[in-house]
Amino acid sequence: MARDIGLNIPAPSEECDDAYCPFHGTLPVRGQILVGTVVSSKMDNTVVIERQYMKMVSKYQRYEKRRSKIHAHNPACISAKVGDIVTIAECRPISKTKSYVVVKAEVPK
């Protein structure tokens, strides 16, 4: 039975026994909700998400493209793969580099 995490995101259909799953474990989510693309899933239960955004350069009154990479926990019930568009939510630090957890993954069209 999946618990309500307080976001307008449906619970995954699969079950898992991961303690760091926000739906089936005890990990609370709070803070930022971000969307990005998975660029790596080689680590165990971890994915790397890349976000692209525009930054204003005030001297030239133009925008420049920037990107950032964020490490996030990937529960077994969601299992995002490279190329998927994922929604991640901020949580307490899970490890030295992971403070986000994947809450939704969708395959791009």
Swiss-Prot record:
InterPro entries: NA-bd_OB-fold (IPR012340), Ribosomal_uS17 (IPR000266), Ribosomal_uS17_arc/euk (IPR028333), Ribosomal_uS17_archaeal (IPR019978), Ribosomal_uS17_CS (IPR019979). GO terms for cellular component: cytosolic small ribosomal subunit. One of its GO terms (biological process) is translation. One of its GO terms (molecular function) is structural constituent of ribosome. Keywords: Ribonucleoprotein, Ribosomal protein, RNA-binding, rRNA-binding. Part of the 30S ribosomal subunit. One of the primary rRNA binding proteins, it binds specifically to the 5'-end of 16S ribosomal RNA. Belongs to the universal ribosomal protein uS17 family. This is Small ribosomal subunit protein uS17A. It comes from Methanosarcina acetivorans (strain ATCC 35395 / DSM 2834 / JCM 12185 / C2A).
